[in-house]
Amino acid sequence: EIEPIDNSYNVIMTQGKVEFGDIIDGKNLDRLVSALGIDNDDLIKEAPVQIVSTGHSKVMIGIKDYKQLHNLRPDMKELNKLSDIINCNGYFVFTFDSKEKDILLKGRMFAPAIGIEEDPVTGNANGPVGAYIVKYNLVKIENDNLNFSAKQGMSIDREGTINVNVHIENSEPVKVQVSGTATVVF
């Protein structure tokens, strides 16, 4: 869906079926945190590292601290090797440590296995993280929808905001939509 707004557009994308894949643990988790340059203690303990998909699977990795998120310098070769082992090509590292009242989380998405060292803003990561937040009750949800905004791209000077709407039935995420403002630049 595309809605014109002034000199730009609001683009809304309904994502595919929500699917929860493997939890990454043991040696693969150790390899992952090492490749990211973090420790297991940096992870949000209530948020298991897990593959989640709404069309394109990503590994969800919740960490406690924004400064650490901002300063990540992943070992892309190691992430690439790990992608072959776990059958997932993207890693979405996020934190709820946001000083901005309208921004629930900030994230970074790495996918070196498909030639993307860092994606500045991606619905293919923020959509699944919305479903993941619902599944693990990581934030308070008061009705049948979770609506939030997330930021990405700050660490590579290509900042953008994405809006996420998760429809919930029987406490489970059933439909995810992402939206944001797009501007034609050519």
Residue ranges of model-derived segments:
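Glycine-rich, charge-dense phosphate/pyrophosphate-binding loop(s)
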Residues: 72, 85-159
